[in-house]
From Swiss-Prot:
One of its GO terms (biological process) is apoptotic process. Expressed by the venom gland. This three-finger cytotoxin has antiproliferative, cytotoxic and apoptotic activities. Both in vivo and in vitro experimental results suggests that this protein possess anticancer potential. Also shows neurotoxicity, cardiotoxicity and myotoxicity. Its main location: secreted. This is Cytotoxin drCT-1.
Length: 20
């Protein structure tokens, strides 16, 4: 899944540093 801070579910799948 692509990093997407607009979607909490996707946001949680983002590695640290990739959640910007």
């Amino acid at each position: 899944l692509k990093c997407n801070k607009l979607v909490p579910l996707f946001y949680k799948t983002c590695p640290a540093g990739k959640n910007l």
